[in-house]
Design a protein with these regions (language model features):
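Extracytoplasmic/secreted envelope proteins and their assembly/folding machinery
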Residues: 13-20, 32, 41-45, 69, ...
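Thiol-based oxidoreductase modules, predominantly thioredoxin-like and allied folds used
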Residues: 27-41, 53-63
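Sec-exported extracytoplasmic/periplasmic mature domains
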Residues: 11, 18-25, 49-50, 56, ...
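Conserved redox-active cysteine motifs that mediate thiol-disulfide chemistry
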Residues: 1-18
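Short alpha-helical
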Residues: 7, 38-39, 100
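Short, internal strand/loop/helix patches
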Residues: 45-80
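Short pre-active-site segment immediately N-terminal to redox-active cysteine/selenocysteine motifs
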Residues: 1-5, 37, 79
Length: 119
């Protein structure tokens, strides 16, 4: 989960695009959710184009951002960026509030038995 007004989100976003390119042929898909207000969708779309994002992107269209937070993770306090790795069956394998460490995350994906390996 990211937003155009979140500096760390903008900085780390290209890393996710890179990871999708690296692991896209495996059972891995990067999906982004913008926490920008729906009225700001053009700004969010512009940022995605600048970052060459060719992944599935959503913008939260609800009025209550707390509903998004509760749906994603009741333990999340709403600070951005927020990253989750979810296994194909829906189990959360990793979650982080704050900026990722790209190499650590890539290693975790590559070594995870359900995310980064070929069978």
């Amino acid at each position: 989960v990211w937003a155009t007004w979140c500096g760390p989100c903008i900085i780390e976003y290209p890393e996710f695009v890179k990871m999708q390119r690296m692991y896209g042929d495996r059972d891995f898909e990067f999906v982004s959710i913008s926490a920008d207000k729906l009225e700001q969708k053009d700004k969010a779309l512009s940022m995605l184009k600048k970052k060459s994002s060719a992944v599935r992107n959503y913008i939260f269209s609800g009025k209550d951002s707390y509903a998004l937070i509760e749906a994603m993770d009741p333990a999340w306090n709403g600070a951005l960026p927020y990253t989750m790795l979810i296994e194909p069956e829906g189990k959360v394998a990793y979650k982080l509030q704050g900026s990722i460490k790209p190499l650590e995350l890539r290693k975790m994906i590559a070594e995870h038995p359900k995310l980064g390996r070929y069978y």
